[in-house]
Every structure is written in structure tokens, then in C-alpha cells.
């Protein structure tokens, strides 16, 4: 028997098919609450190895991910699903397309500024004190 732990605040259901299972069909976490938890540079954990790798490949640190999260809007929700961290812990996550934040970035290789779209998947921990990011990469 496989033992796993649900670490997210949402836990009305549990994953049964090894992850990727869709949940609810509406956001589980309020964007204003996510922003409040991460305000001031606190309350964020890059929860998976993939997320740490995503941030590193973007040349981002903790504060850059928080800045992206602080720019999220309610209308950017895509879906909700179960995700694991590869160490028997599961989180019910909301996926958001952070394109409406209108992040314009300078791309030195082409000497041009462009609007860049990002995808972020996140959850709030059981205590309601931490936003855990599962994915954070360009769309």
C-alpha cells in the first residue's frame, strides 16, 4: 500500500490515479488571499524540483516569483488538479495563465521588449500560511 500525504488546504477529495486529476472546475484559492500571504516577500515555497528548475532557467529568485504572483488576476484561472512533489506529498493546485499581468521584458538577444506570458501552478498549505508553487515557466 502506498502512503501519501495531502499538504494543501483543500482536501475534500484525494488523488486516486497518480496525479493530474482535475478538481472542482473552479478556483480553490482566492487570488486576493494568495497575494496577502506572499505580500512583503514572505509566504512562498518553490515546492517541487521542477519549479526550482523553472525559476533557475528564467534567472529568477524568490522575489521574482512573488512579483509574478502579486500580478495575478481572478480571470487568469485555467483549472485545478492534484500535483505531487515526487516525495509522496500531494497538493490540490490551481493553475493560472499569468498573461494578463502584461509583463513586458527586455530580450537582449533580439534587442527588443516583448510581452511574456507565464504559467504558474500553486496551492495554499494546510495552515494557510504558505503559497506553494508547483510550476512557474513561460507559456
Could you say what each language-model-derived stretch is?
Residues 110-139:
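Enriched for short, Lys/Arg-rich terminal
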Residues 21, 47, 86, 107-109:
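Short, well-ordered helical secondary-structure segments
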Residues 29-100:
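Compact soluble domain cores
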Residues 3, 8, 75, 97-100, ...:
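Intrinsically disordered, low-complexity segments enriched in small/polar residues
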Residues 73, 103, 124-126:
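Generic secondary-structure microfeatures
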Residues 2-41:
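N-terminal targeting/trafficking signals and adjacent low-complexity tails
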Residues 98-111:
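Short beta-strand segments that buttress and anchor functional surface loops
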Amino acid at each position: 500500500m502506498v502512503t501519501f500525504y495531502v499538504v494543501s488546504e483543500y482536501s475534500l477529495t484525494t488523488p486516486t490515479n497518480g496525479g493530474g486529476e482535475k478538481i472542482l472546475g473552479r478556483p480553490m484559492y482566492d487570488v486576493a488571499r494568495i497575494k496577502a500571504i506572499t505580500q512583503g516577500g514572505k509566504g512562498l515555497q518553490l515546492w517541487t524540483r521542477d519549479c526550482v528548475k523553472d525559476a533557475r532557467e528564467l534567472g529568477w529568485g524568490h522575489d521574482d516569483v512573488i512579483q509574478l504572483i502579486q500580478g495575478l488576476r481572478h480571470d487568469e484561472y485555467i483549472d485545478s488538479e492534484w500535483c505531487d512533489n515526487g516525495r509522496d506529498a500531494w497538493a490540490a493546485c490551481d493553475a493560472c495563465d499569468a498573461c494578463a499581468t502584461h509583463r513586458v521584458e527586455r530580450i537582449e538577444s533580439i534587442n527588443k521588449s516583448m510581452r511574456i506570458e507565464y504559467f504558474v501552478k500553486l496551492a495554499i498549505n494546510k495552515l494557510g500560511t504558505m503559497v506553494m508553487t508547483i510550476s512557474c515557466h513561460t507559456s
